[in-house]
Each structure stands twice: as C-alpha cells, then as structure tokens.
C-alpha cells in the first residue's frame, strides 16, 4: 500500500507541496515541475506515483483552490508536510464516473450535514486521513446540486467497506467507502453549497 514512509526523501525535500503556496509549506513551483517529478517516481514504482498523485492532485488541490483558511490550516498544511493523506471519492458502484448519476447525498441537520452513500475505486481510500466527497445537496437542481465535503476518516458512520484488489499498481490502495448517517460539521463543506 502507498504509505508516506515510502517517500521520506520526497517529504524532506517538500515535494508533496511542489505546486502549493509557500505560506502553507509548499514550494510555490508549477504543475509541470510536479509532473516531471511524478514521472520520475513512476519509473521506479507506478503504484506509489499514483498514490502520491491522488494525494496531491485529488486530495489536497481542491482544498488549496476552494478551502477556507481554517480548512487549509487543518488539512492542506499537514498534507503538504506528509502528516496526512488525502483522497477523492466521486465514483459510485452504479454510476461509474458519471457525477450526475451519483446517489450519495448530504442533508442539512441544523448546523450539521448527514452524509449517506457508497463510493468505489477511491485511490488512497484505505490509508487516507480524509476524503473529498461529492454528494447531492439538491437533487432537484439538474444543472448543479452537487456539493463537495471534506470528510474525516475517523467520523462515526464512515467505513472502508473493502479494499479492492487489482492486477497492477498494487502499492496504490483502492477502496470502497460507505457513509451511513455520517454526521459532518458545517465547516466540512468545501466551497459553496450547490
């Protein structure tokens, strides 16, 4: 499985923050530089390169682009430092990658959100500390209606239901995740409610 211990030199050199702002611990470089380094890592182990890319581009980048300062301090800074691993969960068993066909939903409950649904093929799903989750907040709105949440893995109602075994890239874990009445704080919303 992808684990941060495999890339200790990358952590030491700050490579998990190549394209992130220096004020969050990043190096402030461009995506081309990040891609070159990912390509070089992929020459030795494509699975680990995939895990790193999932963490940086799918788990951390949405927070850098759309997160509040508090979310950036809580998730982005430790993700760049290698203290947390992030993941992204959009794909679902009966929807594939068609985001409009997802069933996962989040319903407001006072100052909280109640998240229910199943996600699959989630890279870093086993080893992550948090997941960026797409869920319907307004099923009636066919144009928008999907909001994004940062979900801590240790919340009650969040379960890694299974690790998906695959033929290649075995060092990159892929999982199915289940959210059953998972109560999220109001500040779990990433960006604006759709």
Model-based region annotation:
Residues 82-90:
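A short, Trp-centered hydrophobic/proline-enriched beta-strand micro-motif
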Residues 104-107:
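A structural signal for short hydrophobic beta-strand segments in well-ordered beta-sheet cores
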Residues 112, 116-160:
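A short core secondary-structure module
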